[in-house]
Amino acid sequence: MLPQPAQSARHESIAGTHRIYHRNPGSLNAKDGLLGHGQRPLAALERKGIRVIQGAITAIDPQARAAEVEGRRLEADALIVALGADLAPERVPGFQAHAHNLYEAQAIPPAAEALRAFRGGQVMIGVFGVPYKCPPAPYEAALLLRGFFSERRVQADIEVFTPQPMSLPVLGQAGCDVVEGRLADYGITFLSNHQAVAVEAGEVVFTAGRRPYDLLLGVPPHRCPQVVAQSGLTDGGEWVPVNPRTLETKFPGVYAIGDVVAIPMADGKPLPKAGVFAEAEGEVVAERIAAAFAGGESQAAFAGEGSCYLEVGNGEAMLVQGRFLDTPAPQVTLLGPSRAYLEEKRAFETERLQKWFG
């Protein structure tokens, strides 16, 4: 939120109930159970002149460009909604009781403990709903776990399932063949078109059949935060529609960025939910607001360009990069694998944390 215009603008960041920023919990360092490297206290933003307000956001009034934080109403000249996607494991009966949630930071330590205690059998990694953030993460997890079990000489059969027709549809069939080929090379079974509807002790229930497991790691369904849905920003849909170039909502002076938005690509599929897009969108919105507050107009526009790394084991990574908003279709390529891409991946993560938090 930017409560005051022009030169005197003061930046406020509403942190919600979280005090700690977690980077990519779904990318799975669960085998170590170490989250510290990817964590930063949000209070560190105050060193950059950003005021962090701690508390649950209980209401959003987009017509007034206002938000309510635990009873305190905050009004602004510009409002940026960046509340992400909430995890909804409760939508799958039995998930919370039987699966380890790959995307919940607090669930990583118990998942790590379960992995260290595992002595062999069937491991399943499942996507329980789409869309979900960081689409490559389940496949990265499977490949890294293969290396983890091999180092420990643990005999594990690993399966990965998704309700989608291929691993990463945005890559097209050729790119998915490469990813799925890597899984096969590592002895990992890939199951497409598998929509899970429930989890029971020792079995995942699908729309057609069941499959057994001894250890289950899952990506739960995602949903728009309730406070956003109740505000009218979703316009009756599942996510917030925005101008794909300016990130403006239908309410003047109200923007939405990141996983909370729905931006269609030219092929009709939604833009993947990925941090690289949230960052680029945020930069566009910041430029446009700053220009407006100074009495001008910015031509900054979201280009839909981005890349992400997929760690694939053996000290290597692949690179997914593209122009996702191109017409008549997204232009997305898959490069690698190579050790250089893994080095780039680690450097990128470190640099981003340093840039944002110091």
What are these regions (language model features)?
Residues 94-119, 203, 212-215, 219-280:
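FAD-site-proximal beta/loop scaffold in flavoenzymes
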Residues 9, 43, 48-64, 74, ...:
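A Rossmann-like FAD-binding core segment of flavoenzymes
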Residues 257-304, 310:
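A conserved FAD-binding loop/helix module that cradles the flavin
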